[in-house]
């Protein structure tokens, strides 16, 4: 290893300090592995040969072109003659490709004559052969075409006519579009089948993924038992669940093909215990018509569906394995009683397996005892690495292994208490060594080898026994603990603000205590080699396992033979438990922790989405009337100037009405011209408001400019109110609402494909503003818009750790949430038919999906409006789909239906399902008959329904329980509850009321930060804008203003009279957040050295996080003698900078990729930094960075980075520019060198030895190669041998290229070409 001292010498490149010539060289590069040094006479002769070669090549190409058939000609021949074949097509194509290579060779540069390993005669012969072959093929093809079809030109004319005619014929979609396009648009044949089949679309996808589901009573009962047991394990969620309700759910789902939203809405009576009834009408209290229902996420039903999928897949796998095992066993050549017994035990274990892991255990046991048969001789066989077990079995050791006593199966039965053996184990009358002598062979030459092999076989069999694994698994998962500690890299990287800081020092945390995403963080940190993770089973539990196994496996005999055999058995148990079972349990524990963490993270992710999508639209003055139209929204998105701040006006249907660009409305300049532009924009804005009369203004909160913009808007409105007469101003202007809105979703919409389809040719900021306004009007529809084939919704940042989830996992949760909420809200079909964007939630309606919804949408748009729910069957959906969807599709007089006088049934404007219309009509008639004397008229039903709709108070007179008893419908309380609510107010919005953002949300939206990034104690950088004697006004990188008081500047702040003597405008200060004034959008800062060094834990500290462990490690480090030179810590915040020594930097880069770099402090003082780059394994280059324009007021100023950075003659403004302009191009050239064909790894002497060998093979050639210079890291060595002795020259590595002999080369091949021509001009 190339030793790096604490402060290595900054090596100057050996080729530095030489002037660069301006002489230009030809653009040449080499293709040979060696070259000859030729005289000048040879050049003229070879030049003449090259011109001759080019002339012949052009002649050949000219001939070839005249005999080449176009691809269309071959297609024409094939179309008109079924027997026609393009003979030797592949050879013809190959010939063409090789000819191209020859032509390229003809065009090579001057270096082509250095190639000495090509057989010229062979090459010419090959070219002649190709010419003859190509000519014969082409002429035959043309002659055949002429004889059969005539002149090719006439054929081409006919072909063009045919093409024009075929364009008129309708082609298949598969021929017109790429498969990806057809898949995205759901236009494949499979999509057509899904659309046509009268089964809910999501159910079809579900069943396609899991296969055929057994629907007999026994299978459903067996599955319900399994699901119930799983639910009981989920933190007691199954305690209140009735198992019969699970059976009914499975029957409704699989047999009746009813989706979850339908079951939750219309089959409550059949699965009460599966529904959260805490706030429902059937919670045991009296029915209250005035109580507003709330949307509910039916998690238990979705959980049962997920368990249903797992059960079907588990059963499918068990069935497949049963058939496979049976077939394999029947093929066994030796069907002994032992094998039959083993097979029967495997089948019994397979039938009893209840989880995938238990099935894995059974599969391991079967494959151990019934390995794959050897393939017959002569057949191809993939080489397999034979296991030690199979080798022992092959040499007959298995027979001896069976003599240790109880088998693995017997031990497992005893541990599981399934069968207790009363007979004592009989010990052999020989020692193990004596008995092992009978099994010696060539592979196992002595008794100890035989014993070792036999013990291994017994241990493996024990480790593969399902009952034993289940026993150990139960103990391990309940008692195992996890500890974490940082690696050397992690100790440097993970500070108190790092995302892994909370899991840096965990000590013996039990598996069952892991919660949230903690394990995912540990797993990620381990992948990044920042943490070491250890699993451990406590000593007492380990002893328990060994003790219980020994109790059933060891002999109770006291003889010498019994003791000797027991010693062997103890070794077997130790090997089985420690060598096989526990390591596999650790893998299972990791998998289990990952699964649990992802499940919880998915739930949290879904909950955030649920909170957003279940939020109601903005209502004027919180008016909850369902009849009131959506508000007219004026949406505003701030623009920096290009684009300008933009206002868009949306009508109550969310359609774009008008756009106003106003780039000067928020100006705060006192310039006269700026003020004029501002006044003009204010007048235009006020006219915009007067013309369109919006109900609310939604302002996207993205930065502090939006706060000023809000003030300017209010100022303009107040000025208008003051100037205009009272009778001229609309009442709403006095209390004009302006709300902040989150711009994250509108930005996704702006860049999505659907926005271009819905708002073609509109500017991006207009699309964004439209989305902002629509989100206020209908959050559900706006979010659904991004749930199309592109799945743009997955880019919405809902959870800080959502990156740990796969896209498919996230979208499955998105679909679950969207399906549940959409069906509780419903869709106004007629309104959506007139406004396309409102159709976006249709795909989530029960029974539908993206394919069926798209088909239904097209049909409804063509129809314009629909007046009866039953008409939906005429729009391409079958009866089963109609049953699922009908109750959630709202039919009312909206959209184009407003202008129609056609009758619309009021029940179609409710959540009442058509199957319950009879009950609803009967209830309405009873109420109507009670309130009036007219009840026998023909139109009594319509009048009764209108009566209860107009006078919902009449329904309150009914005592529901008594009414149900009178109708003998006590088991339909939930159905009647829904009927009464919907008759009172159809499709009442159950979503939560719209809430404006609170002060915390407003602050984080405006700042663009989060609680994690701008919390108290966070290290930040601030730029000084203004300094007074007592304080400095700064600006953080996020744009927030900061205040640094004099007393917070340094520890001796009280002695500072005037802060302006310490700071200047433009200074960059590294400081810590002291506190946040969220109401004023200000941050108080501190940069005292004592405060900067304080360690602060953020958030809740884990109970198993032990700082003492961390401190003990630090104390141990302090005990180590400080042999290295110290450096001054620097107050620099940059991803590539670390306060570490050169040795620590070497350790940090040791396992990184070549080209990785780090910036660290320099021992040369506070005006220098060191850039360390990994050149090769164990070779690191150090580049000196000189800092300029630094203030020398105090130590804090010196610890900050300079305003200019200089490396060599290049000057940079900051470390980012150093990385972009210096490191990145330098690493690019480094990789070019390392990947060059002439590059060799090794030291200079090792490369010289390689060249000597190459020279011996080709004594007439000048052999050369490139290598890394270990003496001058950052440089390379050009080594070459002309006659006998190696010669060396250095090559410098720079961002601009490679420096060789005072010349800079941007291309390594050009450098090699220059070296060849000027090998004598050193």
Swiss-Prot record:
It holds the Pfam family HHH_9. This is Transcription elongation factor SPT6-like. Residues 18-33, 97-110 have a biased composition (Acidic residues). GO terms for biological process: embryo development ending in seed dormancy; nucleosome organization; transcription elongation by RNA polymerase II; transcription elongation-coupled chromatin remodeling. Transcription elongation factor that enhances the transcription elongation by RNA polymerase II (RNAPII). The keyword Transcription applies. It is found in: Nucleus. Residues 1-17, 48-65 have a biased composition (Basic and acidic residues). Residues 1017-1088 form the S1 motif domain. Residues 1-65, 90-113 are annotated as: Disordered. One of its GO terms (molecular function) is histone binding. PANTHER family: TRANSCRIPTION ELONGATION FACTOR SPT6. Its main location: nucleus. GO terms for cellular component: cytosol; transcription elongation factor complex. The lineage of its organism: Eukaryota, Viridiplantae, Streptophyta, Embryophyta, Tracheophyta. Belongs to the SPT6 family. Keywords: Nucleus, Transcription, Transcription regulation. It comes from Arabidopsis thaliana.
């Amino acid at each position: 290893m190339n030793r790096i001292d604490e402060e290595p010498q900054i090596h100057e490149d050996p080729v530095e300090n030489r002037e660069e010539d301006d002489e230009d060289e030809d653009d040449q590069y080499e293709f040979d592995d060696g070259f000859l040094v030729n005289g000048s006479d040879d050049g003229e002769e070879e030049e003449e040969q090259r011109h001759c070669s080019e002339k012949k090549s052009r002649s050949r190409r000219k001939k070839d072109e005249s005999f080449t058939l176009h691809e269309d000609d071959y297609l024409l021949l094939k179309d008109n003659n079924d027997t026609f074949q393009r003979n030797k097509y592949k050879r013809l194509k190959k010939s063409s490709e090789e000819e191209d290579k020859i032509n390229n060779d003809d065009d090579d540069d001057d270096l082509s004559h250095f190639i000495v390993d090509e057989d010229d005669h062979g090459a010419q012969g090959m070219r002649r052969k190709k010419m003859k072959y190509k000519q014969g093929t082409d002429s035959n093809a043309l002659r055949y075409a002429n004889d059969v079809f005539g002149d090719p030109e006439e054929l081409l004319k006919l072909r063009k006519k045919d093409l024009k005619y075929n364009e008129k014929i309708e082609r298949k979609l598969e021929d017109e579009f790429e498969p990806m396009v057809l898949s995205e648009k759901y236009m494949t044949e499979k999509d057509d089948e899904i659309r046509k089949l009268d089964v809910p679309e999501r159910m079809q996808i579900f069943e396609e993924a899991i296969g055929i589901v057994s629907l007999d009573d026994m299978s459903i009962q067996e599955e319900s038992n399994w699901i119930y047991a799983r639910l009981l394990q989920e933190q007691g969620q199954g305690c209140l669940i009735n198992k019969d309700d699970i059976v009914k759910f499975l029957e409704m789902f699989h047999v009746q093909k009813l989706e979850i939203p339908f079951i939750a809405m219309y089959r409550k009576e059949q699965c009460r215990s599966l529904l959260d009834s805490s706030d429902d009408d059937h919670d045991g209290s009296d029915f209250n018509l005035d109580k507003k229902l709330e949307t509910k996420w039916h998690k238990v039903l979705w959980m049962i569906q997920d368990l249903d999928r797992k059960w079907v897949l588990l059963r499918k796998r068990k069935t497949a394995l049963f058939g496979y095992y049976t077939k394999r066993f029947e093929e066994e050549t030796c069907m002994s009683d032992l094998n039959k017994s083993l097979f029967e035990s495997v089948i019994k274990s397979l039938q009893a397996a209840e989880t995938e892991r238990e099935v894995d255990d059974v599969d391991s046991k079967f494959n151990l005892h019934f390995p794959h048969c050897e393939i017959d001789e002569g057949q191809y066989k993939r080489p397999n690495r034979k296991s030690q077990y199979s080798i022992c079995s092959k040499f007959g050791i298995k027979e001896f292994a069976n003599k240790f006593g109880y088998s693995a199966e017997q031990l497992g039965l005893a541990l599981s208490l399934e069968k207790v053996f009363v007979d004592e184990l009989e010990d052999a009358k020989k020692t193990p060594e004596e008995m092992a002598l009978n099994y010696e062979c060539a592979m196992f030459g002595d008794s100890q080898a035989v014993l070792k092999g036999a013990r291994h076989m017994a241990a493996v069999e024990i480790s593969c026994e399902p009952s034993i694994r289940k026993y150990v698994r139960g103990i391990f998962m309940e008692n195992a603990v996890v500890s974490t500690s940082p690696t050397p890299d992690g100790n440097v990287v993970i500070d108190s603000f790092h995302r892994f800081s909370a899991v840096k020092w965990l000590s013996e945390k039990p598996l069952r205590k892991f919660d949230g995403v903690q394990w995912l963080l540990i797993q990620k940190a381990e992948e990044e080699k920042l943490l070491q993770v250890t699993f451990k089973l406590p000593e007492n539990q380990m002893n328990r396992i060994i003790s219980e196994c020994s109790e059933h496996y060891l002999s109770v005999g006291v003889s010498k033979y019994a003791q000797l055999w027991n010693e062997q058995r103890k070794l077997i148990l130790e090997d089985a438990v420690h060598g096989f079972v526990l390591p596999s349990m650790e893998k299972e524990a990791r998998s289990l922790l990952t699964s649990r963490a992802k499940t919880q993270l998915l739930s949290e992710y879904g909950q955030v989405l649920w909170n957003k999508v279940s939020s109601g639209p903005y209502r004027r003055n919180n008016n909850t009337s369902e009849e009131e139209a959506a508000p007219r929204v004026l949406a505003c998105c701030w623009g920096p100037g290009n684009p300008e701040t933009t206002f868009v006006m949306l009508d109550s249907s969310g359609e774009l009405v008008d756009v106003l660009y106003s780039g000067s409305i928020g100006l705060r300049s006192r310039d006269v011209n700026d003020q004029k532009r501002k006044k003009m924009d204010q007048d235009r804005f006020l006219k915009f408001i007067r013309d369109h009369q919006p109900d609310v203004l939604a302002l996207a909160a993205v930065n502090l400019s939006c706060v000023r913009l809000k003030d300017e808007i209010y100022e303009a409105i107040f000025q208008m109110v003051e100037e205009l007469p009272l009778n001229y101003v609309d009442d709403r202007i006095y209390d004009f609402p302006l709300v902040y809105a989150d711009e994250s979703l509108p930005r996704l919409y702006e860049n999505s494909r659907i926005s271009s389809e819905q708002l073609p040719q509109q500017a991006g900021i207009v699309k964004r503003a439209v989305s902002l306004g629509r989100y206020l009007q209908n959050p559900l529809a706006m979010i659904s818009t991004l749930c199309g084939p592109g799945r743009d919704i997955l880019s919405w940042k809902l959870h800080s750790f959502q990156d740990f989830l796969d896209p498919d996992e996230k979208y499955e949760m998105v679909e679950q949430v969207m399906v549940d909420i959409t069906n509780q809200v419903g869709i106004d079909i007629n309104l959506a038919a007139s406004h396309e964007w409102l159709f976006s939630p249709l795909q989530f309606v029960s029974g539908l999906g993206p394919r069926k919804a798209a088909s239904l949408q097209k049909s409804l748009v063509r129809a314009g409006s629909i007046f009866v729910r039953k008409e939906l069957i005429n729009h391409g959906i079958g009866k089963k789909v109609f049953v699922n969807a009908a109750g959630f599709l709202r039919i009312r007089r909206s959209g184009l239906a407003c202008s129609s006088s056609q009758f619309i049934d009021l029940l179609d404007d409710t959540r009442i399902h058509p199957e319950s219309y009879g009950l609803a009509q009967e209830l309405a008639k009873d109420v109507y008959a009670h309130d009036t004397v007219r009840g026998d008229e023909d139109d009594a039903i319509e009048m009764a329904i209108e009566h209860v709709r107009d006078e919902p108070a009449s329904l309150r007179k009914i005592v529901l329980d008594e009414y149900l008893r009178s109708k003998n419908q006590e088991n339909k309380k939930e159905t009647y509850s829904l009927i009464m609510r919907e008759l009172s107010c159809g499709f009442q919005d159950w979503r939560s009321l719209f809430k404006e953002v609170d002060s915390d949300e407003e602050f984080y939206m405006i700042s663009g930060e989060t609680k994690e990034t701008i919390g108290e104690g966070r290290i930040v950088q601030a730029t000084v804008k203004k300094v007074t004697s007592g304080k400095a006004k700064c600006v953080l990188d996020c744009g927030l203003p900061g205040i640094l008081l004099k007393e917070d500047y340094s520890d001796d702040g009280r002695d500072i009279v005037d802060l302006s003597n310490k700071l200047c405008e433009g200074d960059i200060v590294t400081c810590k957040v002291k506190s946040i004034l969220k109401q004023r959008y200000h941050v108080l800062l501190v940069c005292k050295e004592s405060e900067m060094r304080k360690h602060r834990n953020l958030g809740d500290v884990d109970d198993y996080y032990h700082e003492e462990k961390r401190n003990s490690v630090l104390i141990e480090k302090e005990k180590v003698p400080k042999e290295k030179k110290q450096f001054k810590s620097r107050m620099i915040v940059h991803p590539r900078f670390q306060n570490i020594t050169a040795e620590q930097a070497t350790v940090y880069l040791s396992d990184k990729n070549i080209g990785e770099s780090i910036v660290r402090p320099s021992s040369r003082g506070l005006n220098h930094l060191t850039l360390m780059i990994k050149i090769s394994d164990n070779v690191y280059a150090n580049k000196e960075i000189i800092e300029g324009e630094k203030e020398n007021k105090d130590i804090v100023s010196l610890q900050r980075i300079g305003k200019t950075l200089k490396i060599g003659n290049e000057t940079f403004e900051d470390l980012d520019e150093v990385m972009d302009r210096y490191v990145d191009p330098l690493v690019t050239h480094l990789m070019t060198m390392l990947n060059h064909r002439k590059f060799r790894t090794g030291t200079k002497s090792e490369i010289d030895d390689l060249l000597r060998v190459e020279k011996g093979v080709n004594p007439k050639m000048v052999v050369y190669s490139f290598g890394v210079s270990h003496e001058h890291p950052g440089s390379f060595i050009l080594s070459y041998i002309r006659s006998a002795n190696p010669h060396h020259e250095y090559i410098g590595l720079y961002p601009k290229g490679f420096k060789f002999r005072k010349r800079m080369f941007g291309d390594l091949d050009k450098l090699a070409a220059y070296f060849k021509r000027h090998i004598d001009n050193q």
